[in-house]
Structures are given as C-alpha cells and as structure tokens.
Amino acid sequence: MKFAVMGRMGAEEAIGPTVVAGISNADPCGGRSRRKSSRRAGGRIACAICWAMLPLAASAELSNDSLLGPGLRYRPAYDGSSSQRVELVPVIRYFGETWFIRSTQGVLETGVRTELAPGLHAGAQLAYEPGRKSSESAFLRSHQIAEIPGGASAGLQLEWDHTVGPVPITLLARVRKNIDSERGAQADLRLSVGVFHGGPVSAGIFGQATWADEKSTTSLYGIAPQQSAVTGLPAFQPGGGLLFSSVGLLWSVDLNPKWVVVGSLESRRLSGNVADSPLVERRSNGYLSAGIAYHY
C-alpha cells in the first residue's frame, strides 16, 4: 500500500537558541561602516532562518520510531485512471533487532535486515502488491477489463540513512518480484529529505522512480489480441523500463509526546511507452493521505 507518512520530530535541542545567541551577541563592528555591519547582520539573520527551518530529527521515512494507527488515502483506481477512490490504510512502522514492518516507504512490507555499516542496512522483504478492481473504474467496467487481484512480492533492499548537518536523508533501493510469475518484477529508488521543523510541525520531501520488466508492464497495461476483440481497445504490448516517477511532500504535527497526525501529498507520472497504453486515461495522478498514529 502506498502510504508515506511523517513521524515525530525531535525536541528543540538548542538549534534555535544557539543561532539566536549568535545573532544577538555578534562581535562589535569596530571601525567598519554601518553598511557593512548591516550586510553582515542581514547575512547572519538569513543563515539563522535557514538553519531554523531544518529538522532536528527524522520524519517517519527518516527515522525508526515505532508507529501504529489508522489512515485514509485518496488515490486513483489505478495509475493512469481518471477515477478516484478513498480507502482505509495502516500507519505502521516497527524495527526490532532484525525484523521490521512498515508502511512508510511506499509499500506495506515486512522482512529482516542487518546493518552492514553505520547507517547502511541490507535486507529482504515481503510486500503487499495492490491489484486493480474494475468496480473502482467506470472506464474498466465499460470496456469489460478483467480485474487484477492483489498479491505479494518478495525481494531485496539496501537502505542508507545519513545526516548532512541537521538534515536527515534516507536513500532506499529495493527490488520486488511478484509471487505470481506472470506479474513480473519492479525496482524502486526512493530519496527522502527532511526540510522543515518548527514547534510541533515537521515536513519533508521525497522523490521516487520505479522500473518494471516487460511481464510487469504487460500485466498492468498490455492489451492482448484476444482482449482487444472483447474490449474494443487496440492491442498493445508495452516493454520494460521506467514505469513511473513521483515527487511528494510529507508532514506531521505532534499532538503530544505519544500521538501524532501524519500525512503526505504525492504527484505520480507514468513514463515510457506504458503512458501510451489504451488503459491510460491520464498520465499523471495525485495521492493524498492522512492518519493518526501512536508512538509505542
């Protein structure tokens, strides 16, 4: 399940006070002109504002804090559909010594992982792979397109967590092979960066690219000759390659030390010849999700 959420940011931990002190206790200007002093003070204020905007700790994609709660997601019936739906989704993340489960990196997945070096983890996962319901799309119903049932995938991943100054960064590479051999395999590359922290409010941005082999694209967007005869749509055979790219915003608001409201906004665009499939009504789709989670 696609659900990128934000977790709790850390306490103030002196960034604000330290920077402010740096401004208010600036060295005397001595014999320098007022203009130079003004420029220097302005530069210090600008730096202070920039540093104050940076997060002190990681968001849900950028930390390992445990989360559990319900959420709602507004999504297309499938990528490329003009129909939108609302569904209930989990907000979950837990990391044990080796075992983990989470919904905060684009899919609902569980598995094991090990630390290869500080901040670098390798692992294996089982993930939920959503299907495609004709009942959710007027276009699919009108053309008698068969449903694709939800399923599962197995794969490997490599994740790097790092900080540049106070900025948390997570880079995730993941390969997913569907348990149903006819649905092929996909690979994800996802980058998440924390960009804002002010009081109880935190925010981050992310970008993702997903590639798919020919089996995967054909199962999702292909039209076989026999299907063409039934649906009235032209036969279409997509190849493998970049499936979609997306960018998004992550946010969270701490209600208290134990409860947090989380959410995300994502714009996703189909790529390659998949975007030319007769099943694609529009190349770009939006996702909106929000939920409430308990820190445990």
Predicted regions and their residues:
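Outer-envelope beta-barrel architecture signal
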Residues: 62-68, 86-88, 97-99, 116-122, ...
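Transmembrane beta-barrel strands of outer-membrane/channel proteins
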Residues: 68-74, 103-105, 124-128, 171-177, ...
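Solvent-exposed loop/turn segments connecting transmembrane beta-strands
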Residues: 77-84, 101-104, 116, 148-151, ...
